[in-house]
Amino acid sequence: MKRQGFQFKQFFIEHQDCAMKVGTDSIMLGSWVTGGDLINASETQRFLDIGTGSGLLAIMLAQKSSEQTHISGIDIDKDAIGQATRNMANSPWSHRLDAQQASVQSFTQNCDNPKFALIISNPPYFNSPILTHEKQAQKRVAARQTSELTHHTLLNNVVRLLAPSGVFYCVLPSDVSQAFIELADPLGLSLIKQLTVFSKPDTNALRELLAFRFNDPSCIRDTISRALTSPEPPTRDTLTIYTQSHQYSDQYKALCKDYYLNF
């Protein structure tokens, strides 16, 4: 029987048991993150994928990170974790990957060494309830509704899990991203990088790829100066996925070339 999934350059992702299939959001986020300096670190470090689903983001990180990096994926859905575990086992980096069925709250409470150099998430973003009785549809709704994981809960756990010099990456719809940024700031997470994504030229913004880091008070001695000092403004860029003729743009190809089979 033919496998249901998506073939990347160095690995295959099966996703038939997952509520959320392989999609552009995660591919963009994983590609964007793996261009960062943390990926090439030579020291032992740990990464975490919150809401791992099929394990795609965790495996994308494994492809580009050093042998000293271990990546864990967590998800509340049993079927998704089963799928992620199989995808990880079939990847070339199985020895550096693991998947656990857990909510981020329980994972944080039970984690023996809760400091990750990099945390990544493609989190839920719908607020309003959607009623459905079909099992797979229910799971898809849960994966995309904040009733299962509110943004406030996500951020509160990220600040407990993230190493002092670590970076948190996520992708959100453009119309909810500013509220998310404003939630992160009082928790000590400052936006350091933002990529605004457009589907085609002359369209409204579609997605925001965001990177956060803890405010760094190390160079400021007194509390008053620290409170009055603003962090460096974030680096901002834009990306357009398609040309007007609905072909992948050169910019999008350049971003995802290490993963897409035909780029």
UniProtKB/Swiss-Prot annotation:
InterPro entries: DNA_methylase_N6_adenine_CS, SAM-dependent_MTases_sf, Small_mtfrase_dom, tRNA_Adenine-N(6)_MTase, tRNA_adenine-N6_MeTrfase
Catalyzed reactions per annotation: adenosine(37) in tRNA1(Val) + S-adenosyl-L-methionine = N(6)-methyladenosine(37) in tRNA1(Val) + S-adenosyl-L-homocysteine + H(+)
EC top class, as a word: transferase
GO cellular component entries: cytoplasm
EC numbers: 2.1.1.223
Bridged cysteine pairs (disulfide): none
Entry keyword Plastid: no
Compartments, record wording: Cytoplasm
Cited Pfam families: MTS
Entry-linked PROSITE patterns: N6_MTASE (PS00092)
KW tRNA processing (keyword) present: yes
Keywords tagged on the record: Cytoplasm, Methyltransferase, S-adenosyl-L-methionine, Transferase, tRNA processing
CDD domains: AdoMet_MTases
Domain of life where this protein originates: Bacteria
GO molecular function per UniProt: nucleic acid binding; tRNA (adenine-N6)-methyltransferase activity
Gene Ontology BP annotations: methylation; tRNA processing
The protein's role, per its UniProt record: Specifically methylates the adenine in position 37 of tRNA(1)(Val) (anticodon cmo5UAC).
Full protein name: tRNA1(Val) (adenine(37)-N6)-methyltransferase
Protein's organism: Pseudoalteromonas atlantica (strain T6c / ATCC BAA-1087)
